[in-house]
Amino acid sequence: MSTSLPLRDDGAVRASFALALFVLLGLGLGYSLVATGITSALMPDQAHGSLLRADGRVIGSSLVAQPFADARYFQPRPSAAKYDPTAAAGSNQARSNPELLARIATARAEIAQRDGIAPDAVPGELLTQSGSGLDPHLSPAGAQVQLRRVAAARGWPEQRVAALLQAATEQPQFGLLGQPRINVLALNLALDRAGDGVPGTENGVEQQR
């Protein structure tokens, strides 16, 4: 005959349920609300997606690249995700992949013709996709090769575009982290503002909203 005592929870079930509820509401909901409130107060732009506005309208985010069809604009790096934030990804193609090599060769020829430079002068960043496919930045060299084309398309002296390019160049964070870089969307907005005082209405920025 069994002499074991009957099972008793002594409130263990209620305690477990209360703990689970506290973790769910206190940490899952409460922590998120507090963190969101703090970041919104201290860094409102970053907390809301680092959005860029023109003429009172959101035209993009400084964190996400977007394409520009008009010759008056600087072009970002190519994107395997077609610049879709919901499909961020690289091509995952090996360096020896024939499709990758063919695509790079085609892009090199197209960019050289578009920007009026020698094929060997095309920077690698304009030929290759970033890991996310959404890199919003170019190096100064990647923008510099496009300067002549942008200036000619706008009918501006090259020095005018060069000054805006220089002003848009971001230095390494704290002088140590990263490399000098240029946010392509921010630079293109600066071009519009300098052009006619109506930012975001040029063909390209407006079309990519």
From Swiss-Prot:
It is a single-pass membrane protein. GO terms for molecular function: ATP binding; P-type potassium transmembrane transporter activity. It comes from the Bacteria. One of its GO terms (cellular component) is plasma membrane. Its main location: membrane. The chain crosses the membrane at residues 18-38. GO terms for biological process: potassium ion transmembrane transport. Keywords: ATP-binding, Cell inner membrane, Cell membrane, Ion transport, Membrane, Nucleotide-binding, Potassium, Potassium transport, Transmembrane, Transmembrane helix, Transport. The keyword Nucleotide-binding applies. It is found in: Cell inner membrane. NCBIfam families: kdpC, PRK00315.1. The system is composed of three essential subunits: KdpA, KdpB and KdpC. Belongs to the KdpC family. Part of the high-affinity ATP-driven potassium transport (or Kdp) system, which catalyzes the hydrolysis of ATP coupled with the electrogenic transport of potassium into the cytoplasm. This subunit acts as a catalytic chaperone that increases the ATP-binding affinity of the ATP-hydrolyzing subunit KdpB by the formation of a transient KdpB/KdpC/ATP ternary complex. PANTHER family: POTASSIUM-TRANSPORTING ATPASE C CHAIN, POTASSIUM-TRANSPORTING ATPASE KDPC SUBUNIT. This is Potassium-transporting ATPase KdpC subunit. The gene is kdpC.
